[in-house]
Amino acid sequence: MKSIFTARQATLLLVLTASFAHSGDWPRWLGPQSDSHWKESGLLEKFPASGPVVKWRVPVRWGYSGPAVAAGKVFVMDYDITEGKPDANPGGRTKIKGQERVRAFDSATGKELWTHAYDAPYELSFPAGPRCTPAVDGELVYSLGAEGFLTCLSTIDGKVLWELDLKKEYKVESPIWGFSAHPLVVGDLLIVKPGGEGTTAVALDKKTGKEVWRALASKEPGYAPPVLITHGGQDQLIIAHGEAINSLDPLTGKVS
């Protein structure tokens, strides 16, 4: 049986009930608090026998990115392959060429509002597109591609506000399964995980992309996204990778 990730073209669906259409946003991976908790009331306990109502659907290309929903827009990443085949190649790296795209749709109608595309050759295992869900913060949307290309775009028109190639900036290699740790907005900071000596976790000014702090050392960044928790009255930034789990002060990057 084919999965949505092995089909040549997937479809982005918006499945709604009347009450859901006016409920809260889901602006990043695992929701507003990154806890996978939907706080709205009146949700269906089970779908009707005929299935949920599909309000609209649009075709998207390759990728593993989930949708982010905020301020009447749906944001998703995909990968438009121009050369090669995205063979799984477990344990090895497959070379293909294409463009990563950040796409914005009207959440009520599915109308495409804008697309930002850039060249992104891959050399990865399972090279079928970006892994990370966009993160929306006000009028800014952040995306991280499978080869570590980070962008900050305007949610209004897709204009590039700043961008950063994590591999070049921090002199690291792509993990074999690609950069998969979803970016996390914490106050005025954007937290990312490049990996490497002293740069396993990095905080950037979310408006400019300038580095604020860097912390920890690891061979690879791992695949777990950064998580913000509050414990004992103190905010803690949890960073997990293949060698350790650390709790950092999110403002300074110091081990707490």
Please annotate each region the language model reported.
Residues 2, 14-15, 46, 161:
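Intrinsic low-complexity, intrinsically disordered segments enriched in polar/basic residues
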Residues 9-19:
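Bacterial N-terminal signal peptides
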Residues 1-11:
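Bacterial N-terminal signal peptides that target proteins for export
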Residues 22-256:
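Noncatalytic, solvent-exposed loop/strand surfaces
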Residues 4, 17-20, 244:
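A subset of signal/propeptide-processing and intrinsically disordered low-complexity segments
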